[in-house]
């Protein structure tokens, strides 16, 4: 049983069964026996690792296979020092890391500008959009930015390129009576760029045919996951959870197909957009990952509608641009869990994950890491609990090599930006009576 759980990327758990008031058997986790079993599981994993490399022929074959798959790419270095930027404000001089990032967007494919706050991501994206249009690399760029920054983005765009022809979406433009007219302006106008908010972007529908194809592919992924769980005698609650996901997707598909088609609706495909620049892309990190793993922190099996919508549009743009139409920008690509790195890869290098057979989260996780169960302070702050996290990594050079095919990473240490020196001071403050009372109530509810 321990070996079977290990092969299925699960941490082993031991349950006792007690009868409730209605005579039904109820599983109760046996913490002591579970701890012993997990220690045995760790020993088995360690022994398997030792066994794998003992045989010279097997070691050589596996090493060759791994290197051919993951160590066969030389990282490309982008140099934008030759770029001239016609039409740019002559009073503004971009830094070397900015022109290199612009060169990456122009000459590479999908890109993640993982630059620290203050590194100049806004000007990088604006200049890349203008040069892409001038060089014929794209016909119309769409900037998707936080709602409260729309006007600031428009101002920054015209500061860098005073003569640029841009269309800015304000709140009134996406009101029901104005939306159709505004979308028609996008579709028929020859703009250098269109700027709109995150919530407005979500209101641009994909065609019914494309939505149907996308949802059916999701349903097939879930059905395959359910079949794998059944073949490996997966836990009932996991199968039930994935069945619920399948039913929700099926219901979503039925609603889509039963909705009366409106001929006057302009779809995203009809707007002529062939490149999107997404600012603060970490807002789209809640993209569901279907997995056999149980209750692992950071792995979401439910997704936000805006993330699903963004993923669908990224896949569409990949299809019409051969993987060159999506540029993300964020100072925090990974904030809470390394699962977010996998999510970014799904958005930006889905075809590469397909080539490596890593589109399914379990395949990605087993290649680059493993789950670790450790005792930690409970959220209510009054006790401890065992929590499983995707926290231990191996093959990191290969993972980062794969990630850096799309990610342009610039940290504060790498840039040495002219910022004032900060003096940090920790001040311990005594909890107030109200805070103590609220924490006490939370602890009671948790129990």
Predicted regions and their residues:
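Walker B catalytic acidic pair
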Residues: 279-280
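Charged, low-complexity intrinsically disordered regions
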Residues: 1-72, 162, 186, 190-194, ...
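Charged, low-complexity interaction regions
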Residues: 231-239
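Conserved pre-motif I regulatory segment
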Residues: 72-114
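Short coil/turn segments at secondary-structure boundaries
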Residues: 18-19, 62-65, 76-84, 116, ...
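Inter-lobe coupling linker of SF2 helicases/translocases
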Residues: 179-225, 236-237, 244-275, 285, ...
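Conserved SF1/SF2 helicase motif Ia
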Residues: 116-119, 124-155, 161-165, 320-325
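Conserved helix-turn-beta segment of the N-terminal RecA-like "Helicase ATP-binding" lobe
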Residues: 148-174, 181, 185-188, 348-352
